[in-house]
């Protein structure tokens, strides 16, 4: 095997990056998870957990748990897959410059303009309907809270990319062990699964028991969920290691055992999600105090969360590698616009929910909640997709979006 450290040094001397062929299965998996993000935000106002609209549908609570228990870790994993090849191809300077334009600039636009405008809808809906946008914006950036919405993922990813560049410069051989494990997992994917699972338990369970699941660290618009910092870091760098070697010879090879054994990952996903739902039922129907859970319950939920997060990440990647790696796909038209859709979508989501607040579209609240969520999702996807397509026509915008 060619040493990663041997390829890293000449990469730093490259003056300009060269184009790299896209991986259809991974592109489609990333687009699929972006659609899950849109669904997540479209339905959360109509959950018993969300406490926003009076119309609620319990099934949406299950959707939120289904998504929130894995999809951000999976997004960091998918993002990390391409970091090491990008560093090797572009060198550190080009890589960081590209990351600034691709992540830093959009993040600033989001937190300065888009997210304040999005959260203004919540201010009008739940607090003061007479607040002007100028007044709300000034209070947001001077007094707070300065919510970054889904854009928090962008700044955290930028920070992880900077850390990766430092590791690439100072410890270029650091990811080679992970890369070797990926190669060994071509025929034995359980090796990587168990390694990632055990490491996830180590970094997540103590953190969530100490910080709790709902605590966020924030500094101005920079925010991250405290208990998941190390989990996201782990998923990101685990993927960096996979990307440091050839996809065709490692864990994510289309003809590898991970893709072939997709029923195993699907079964693990279903079983771990069932455990999560069982623990939620125990919390609401068995335990004496819904607001204070015993240590055994918190530990069991943390373990179920981690198993589901790892299993579902493997499951989605395996399914796309096995069944959606060639030919055309329903996700292909969205591929080029997926990132822009992610950045923009929260604006139409919150404003559509605001405009329909209090409306009734059916004889029972559950039907109204389903109709509202469907309207929000369809119009959000259409409007954010159209906005992204329009923005991408601006000269140079494709380097950002």
Predicted region positions:
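Alpha-helical transmembrane segments and their immediate juxtamembrane cytosolic regions
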Residues: 2-401
């Amino acid at each position: 095997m060619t040493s990663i450290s041997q390829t890293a040094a000449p990469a730093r001397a490259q003056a300009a990056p060269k184009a790299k062929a896209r991986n259809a299965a991974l592109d489609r998996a990333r687009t699929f998870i972006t659609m899950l993000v849109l669904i997540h935000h479209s339905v959360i106002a109509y959950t018993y957990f969300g406490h926003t609209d009076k119309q609620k549908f319990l099934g949406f609570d299950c959707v939120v748990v289904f998504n929130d228990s894995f999809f951000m870790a999976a997004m960091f994993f998918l993002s990390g897959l391409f970091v090491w090849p990008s560093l090797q191809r572009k060198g550190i300077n080009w890589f960081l410059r590209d990351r600034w334009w691709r992540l830093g600039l959009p993040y600033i636009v989001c937190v300065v303009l888009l997210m304040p405008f999005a959260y203004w809808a919540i201010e009008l809906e739940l607090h003061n309907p007479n607040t002007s946008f100028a007044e709300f914006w000034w209070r947001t950036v001077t007094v707070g809270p300065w919510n970054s919405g889904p854009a928090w993922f962008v700044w955290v990813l930028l920070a992880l990319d900077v850390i990766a560049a430092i590791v690439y410069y100072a410890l270029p051989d650091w990811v080679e062990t992970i890369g070797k494990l990926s190669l060994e997992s071509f025929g034995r994917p359980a090796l990587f699964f168990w390694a990632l699972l055990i490491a996830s338990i180590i970094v997540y369970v103590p953190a969530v028991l100490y910080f709790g699941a709902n605590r966020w660290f924030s500094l101005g618009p920079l925010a991250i969920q405290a208990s998941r910092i190390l989990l996201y870091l782990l998923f990101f760098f685990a993927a960096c290691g996979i990307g440091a070697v050839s996809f065709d010879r490692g864990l994510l090879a289309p003809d590898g055992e991970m893709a072939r054994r997709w029923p195993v990952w699907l079964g693990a996903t279903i079983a771990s999600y069932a455990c999560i739902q069982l623990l939620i039922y125990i919390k609401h129907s068995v335990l004496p105090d819904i607001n204070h859970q015993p240590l055994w319950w918190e530990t069991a939920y943390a373990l179920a969360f981690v198993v589901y997060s790892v299993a579902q990440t493997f499951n989605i990647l395996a399914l796309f590698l096995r069944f959606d790696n060639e030919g055309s796909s329903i996700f292909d038209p969205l591929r080029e616009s997926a990132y822009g859709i992610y950045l923009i979508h929260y604006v139409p989501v919150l404003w559509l929910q605001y405009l329909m607040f209090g409306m009734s579209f059916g004889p029972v609240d559950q039907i109204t909640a389903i109709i509202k969520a469907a309207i929000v999702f369809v119009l959000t996807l259409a409007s954010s997709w159209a906005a992204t397509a329009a923005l991408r026509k601006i000269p140079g915008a494709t380097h950002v979006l």
